[in-house]
Amino acid sequence: MIRAVNPSPSLSGPVVLHAPKVRRSPLVFASPHSGRDYSADLLAWTHLDLIALRRSEDAFVDRLVADAPRHGAPLVEARFPRVFLDPNRAPDDLDAAMFDQPRPGATGSISARAAAGLGVIPRLAADGRPLYQTRLPLAEAQRRLDVFYAPYHTIVRREMEAARACFGDSVLIDCHSMPSSSARGADIVLGDRYGASCSRAVIARAEAAFRRQGFAVVRNRPYAGAYTTEHYGRPEAGMQALQ
């Protein structure tokens, strides 16, 4: 089996903050699923080739929003591959059957996403094939949470709190892509957890901006937002989130 060359070797760590020279906006942009740093230590765990692995990416979304710092808003970029660690999941959203030993304190329950192979440590690639031929060491799951997940969310939280301190409110723009077939007739899907994660004014302003550019926009269907939108979207606390 032929492996492609690592398309984006990272020289600056698994999570990168692109900070503006001067913060001029309450917005914080995040690109959680466009990471393409397929390091040798991660590739060693799977038998799938790089082409199959990369199908799980929201490819190059980070480049679409790369100008955010120039407009006064930070961009948090995950460079680790989503197929090995998904930051848009709760940290305990694990399928216990994937690992060589039980997690301490685990309740035995499993979310629908983890059961489908798409927990914080995914079991399946985008084409439905298993990523692993044997159970993973639980220590490897913890390593990924420590090295990838924790730094990502630490930076997102810090930037949102900094924006709130400056402007009285902060708005996380959680940036993703989608298959063309998943929302027929729509170019843009805005997710606000059905009104729970941001104010009506914020989503209305985003929708109007896209429509002025000629895009067809729908709300929440089929993507209302997952862990990130739900976790950070606290309008009553001055922190909002829009996917």
Indicate residue ranges for each PLM-predicted region:
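N-terminal catalytic or cofactor-binding beta/alpha core of small enzyme domains
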Residues: 2-172, 177-243
